[in-house]
Amino acid sequence: MAHAHIQGGRRAKSRFVVCIMSGARSKLALFLCGCYVVALGAHTGEESVADHHEAEYYVAAVYEHPSILSLNPLALISRQEALELMNQNLDIYEQQVMTAAQKDVQIIVFPEDGIHGFNFTRTSIYPFLDFMPSPQVVRWNPCLEPHRFNDTEVLQRLSCMAIRGDMFLVANLGTKEPCHSSDPRCPKDGRYQFNTNVVFSNNGTLVDRYRKHNLYFEAAFDVPLKVDLITFDTPFAGRFGIFTCFDILFFDPAIRVLRDYKVKHVVYPTAWMNQLPLLAAIEIQKAFAVAFGINVLAANVHHPVLGMTGSGIHTPLESFWYHDMENPKSHLIIAQVAKNPVGLIGAENATGETDPSHSKFLKILSGDPYCEKDAQEVHCDEATKWNVNAPPTFHSEMMYDNFTLVPVWGKEGYLHVCSNGLCCYLLYERPTLSKELYALGVFDGLHTVHGTYYIQVCALVRCGGLGFDTCGQEITEATGIFEFHLWGNFSTSYIFPLFLTSGMTLEVPDQLGWENDHYFLRKSRLSSGLVTAALYGRLYERD
């Protein structure tokens, strides 16, 4: 279901929506990008405008696109036939640019694979590829200089759109670059083929290009010899970073660009297949914005039958997003975005009175003598109803990983569960008990399905049913309300806070940060039932 959510208001029913989340703070998770094929028609979408009146903002747009796909991506076709298909998608792009221009949009982002589609072989994608000169070497305006290079029709159209809309434009396409046999890495067919993002300024100049580094089962494309660490400057918001889809889970280029170039804004074309409970598209987008205190402009393709939906304009404190697994329509999101994003309140700069639950949390962390630690519970002088018996530990598969979990029973309690070196802790209270099973899970190890990467995860999840073996299943609805602290002794500083409530709603934590060498997330007053609250740590050096 898709719906709108505005802090302080009631949920409004809407057939197609952008979910608007305003508020003190926000965070979320991560995911896998993939591609399969299905023929879907073209739709031009609705658009949502989020209105804010900050002095220092710019207007951004992201477009979730139900791309018109090749009916047979394995077939060998002519360049002309390939252009006919791509021009159908580009016609829709142009309509979105003109709609955005009427709203004074200054930058628009289109999704990965939105122009050419997916599931090609190296040979069958060739007619879809544009020649790509290096913007570092050649200054070029494709719209004004269309005959300078052959096989650049897609680049020309995108350049002209940027001019017509008077906006920066970010899009993704397949590109080719010839190589010489003297190059030991040159493929046998004499060319490199790249999954490429391009950036045009509002005057149509090709500002830069980024070639995807972390391919996700994309046999049609090559990995660049060196990682493209690409940033571009704008007159309206300063410096932006750029990367694509699966890149978000790896150090290069995503983390390195943020660390080395001090960017406050990221443009992020993606073709992301949702996988709950931890890796939905809007989860990772939001988590990235919160973890680094930046703005993320994320555009996904829209193919619900493939599990592909979820785009958004995310700041650390609010999100304007779209997720709809039922409707085939596209969606244009437009929002005003702060030039200087404000981050969440961390442990080190929190002010005001500490609430009782936080005092309890701090006592437990400090090993306060008023608290006696047992295997699974803590008895503090003011706590009367902790879990008397330690709940059983069990194992269940979540996201293809073997999690160790404990059930979350009762209206209040303190639990912990450990695996390898990671221990996860939960201090919670519930106003009422729901007829649902929740569990606290831990995983510390190498994830090896659909990519290989080392993760440390502490997760509070609603299980699919009442049996322990249902914990880790994909669910989107829940009624359980919690006030809680979730924390763990992570051995990485790269921790992404995942927070999802009923109906694919992005939730805002009250506080995040380090306390006594443990990273914690605190939340009270959920807006709807809890689906997932997790801390997703990445140990890049152990990949």
Curated annotation (Swiss-Prot):
Q: Which organism is it from?
A: Homo sapiens
Q: Where is the active site?
A: 112 (proton acceptor), 212 (proton donor), 245 (nucleophile)
Q: Which CDD domains match?
A: biotinidase_like
Predominantly, its location class is secreted
Reported EC number(s) for this entry are 3.5.1.12
Q: Record's Gene Ontology CC terms?
A: extracellular exosome; extracellular region; extracellular space; mitochondrial matrix
> What clinical condition is it connected to?
Biotinidase deficiency: A juvenile form of multiple carboxylase deficiency, an autosomal recessive disorder of biotin metabolism, characterized by ketoacidosis, hyperammonemia, excretion of abnormal organic acid metabolites, and dermatitis. Biotinidase deficiency is characterized by seizures, hypotonia, skin rash, alopecia, ataxia, hearing loss, and optic atrophy. If untreated, symptoms usually become progressively worse, and coma and death may occur.
What are the GO MF terms of this UniProt record? biotinidase activity
Q: Which UniProt keywords apply?
A: Disease variant, Glycoprotein, Hydrolase, Secreted, Signal
Name of this chain's protein: Biotinidase
CN hydrolase domain residues: 72-351
Q: What is the effect of changing residue 444 to H?
A: In BTD deficiency; profound and partial; 52% decrease in biotinyl-transferase activity
Q: Which gene encodes it?
A: BTD
Pfam families for the chain: CN_hydrolase (PF00795), Vanin_C (PF19018)
What does changing residue 451 to D do? In BTD deficiency; partial
